[in-house]
C-alpha cells in the first residue's frame, strides 16, 4: 500500500509540473492571439471591448502572471478549459469532446487488438521456437521500423483511390450527420479501416518481439523445469507459469500505449485527415489556438499519468514481490 501511495504522490507532482509548464509555454510564444482572432474575423471593436477579450481568454495585461496562474488553476478545478480561438465562442471542452471519441475509437480499439494479437503470437513464438511464427518476425520487424505516416501514404497509394472500397481521407461520407444509425456507423467504420490497418501493422511486431524474448527467458527458469517434472499439462505450464510471468513488462508497455492513445497518432490522423484529437492539435498549432493547445496537452498528460498508475496497480496484482516490497 505504501508503494502505491508513493506512486500516487509522484504522479500528482508530475501532473502539477506538467500543468504549470502547459500554462507558461503559450505565453512565451511570440504573437498576440487576440489580435490574430480579430484579424481572422476582420472585427472592428473598441478598446474596452478588446480589453474584455483579453480578460475573457485569461490574458489580462493588467494582471500579473501569478494572478493569471491562480485563475488558470481555478478554471481547471471547475473543469473550465477556456474558449477556443478558432471555434469561438465554443469552449475548448466542447471542441475536444467532439474529436476525442474519434481518436479513442480508432487508436483505442486498434491498440487493444494489436496488444492481444501480438502477445498471443509472442507466447507461441517463444514457447515453440522454430515454428512458422519465427518466419514472420523479420517482416514484422521491418514494418515496425517504418514510420506511421509513411505506411499511411503507402496504404493510400496502394489501396485507396477512385472506385476503391477504402476511402483515402475523412471520418465519414460528406453529407452524413454523426449519429448511431445504419448510415453513419458503416461509413465511419469504412473510413477507419486504412488508418487502423496502418497503426496495427506498425505496432503489432513490437508486442510479438517483446513477449517472445520474455517467454524464451522465462522458459529457462528452474520453476518451469520443476513444473514439467511434476507432469503438469503443457498448456498449464505455458499459460499459468511462463506467460503470466513473461507478461509483466508488456503490461507496463500496454498501459503506456493506452496513455498515448489520445495523442500518439498525430501523423496518421494528418495523413488521412481523420477528425481525431491529433488532427485537431495540428490545426490548433497552425492557427495559434493556445487555449485549445493547452487543453489537448492537458488531456494527453492526464491520460499518460493515469495509464502509468493503472500499470502500477496491475503490477501489484500480478507480481507478489511488489506487494511485499510495498
Task: List the predicted regions and their residue ranges.
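N-terminal signal-anchor/signal peptide hydrophobic helix marking the start
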Residues: 5-11
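Alpha-helical transmembrane segments of integral membrane proteins
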Residues: 2-3, 96, 100-133, 148, ...
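Hydrophobic alpha-helical transmembrane segments of membrane transport/permease proteins
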Residues: 15-68, 163-184
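An internal, D/E-rich "acidic patch" concept
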Residues: 60-119
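Membrane-water interface segments at the C-terminal ends of transmembrane alpha-helices
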Residues: 21-30, 71-74, 139-170, 198-200, ...
Amino acid at each position: 500500500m505504501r508503494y502505491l501511495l508513493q506512486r500516487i504522490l509522484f504522479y500528482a507532482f508530475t501532473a502539477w509540473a506538467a500543468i504549470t509548464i502547459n500554462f507558461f509555454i503559450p505565453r512565451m510564444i511570440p504573437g498576440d492571439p487576440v489580435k490574430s482572432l480579430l484579424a481572422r474575423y476582420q472585427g472592428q471593436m473598441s478598446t474596452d471591448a478588446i480589453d474584455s477579450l483579453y480578460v475573457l481568454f485569461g490574458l489580462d495585461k493588467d494582471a500579473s502572471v501569478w494572478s493569471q496562474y491562480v485563475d488558470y488553476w481555478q478554471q481547471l478545478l471547475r473543469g473550465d478549459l477556456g474558449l477556443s480561438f478558432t471555434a469561438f465562442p465554443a469552449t475548448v471542452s466542447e471542441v475536444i469532446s467532439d474529436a476525442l471519441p474519434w481518436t479513442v475509437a480508432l487508436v483505442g480499439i486498434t491498440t487493444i487488438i494489436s496488444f492481444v494479437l501480438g502477445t498471443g503470437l509472442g507466447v507461441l513464438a517463444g514457447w515453440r521456437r522454430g515454428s512458422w511464427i519465427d518466419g514472420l518476425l523479420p517482416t514484422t520487424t521491418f514494418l515496425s521500423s517504418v514510420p506511421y505516416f509513411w505506411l499511411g501514404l503507402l496504404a493510400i497509394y496502394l489501396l485507396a483511390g477512385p472506385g476503391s472500397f477504402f476511402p483515402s481521407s475523412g471520418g465519414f461520407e460528406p453529407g452524413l450527420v454523426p449519429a448511431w444509425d445504419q448510415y453513419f456507423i458503416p461509413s465511419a467504420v469504412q473510413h477507419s479501416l486504412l488508418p487502423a490497418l496502418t497503426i496495427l501493422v506498425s505496432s503489432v511486431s513490437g508486442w510479438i518481439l517483446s513477449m517472445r524474448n520474455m517467454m524464451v527467458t522465462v522458459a529457462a527458469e528452474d520453476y518451469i523445469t520443476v513444473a514439467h517434472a511434476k507432469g503438469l499439462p503443457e498448456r498449464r505450464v505455458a499459460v499459468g507459469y511462463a506467460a503470466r510471468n513473461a507478461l509483466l513488462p508488456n503490461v507496463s508497455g500496454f498501459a503506456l500505449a493506452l496513455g498515448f492513445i489520445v495523442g500518439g497518432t498525430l501523423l496518421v490522423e494528418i495523413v488521412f485527415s481523420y477528425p481525431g484529437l491529433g488532427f485537431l492539435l495540428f490545426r490548433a498549432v497552425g492557427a495559434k489556438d493556445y487555449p485549445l493547445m493547452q487543453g489537448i496537452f492537458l488531456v494527453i498528460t492526464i491520460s499518460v499519468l493515469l495509464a502509468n498508475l493503472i500499470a502500477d496497480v496491475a503490477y501489484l496484482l500480478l507480481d507478489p514481490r511488489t506487494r511485499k516490497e510495498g
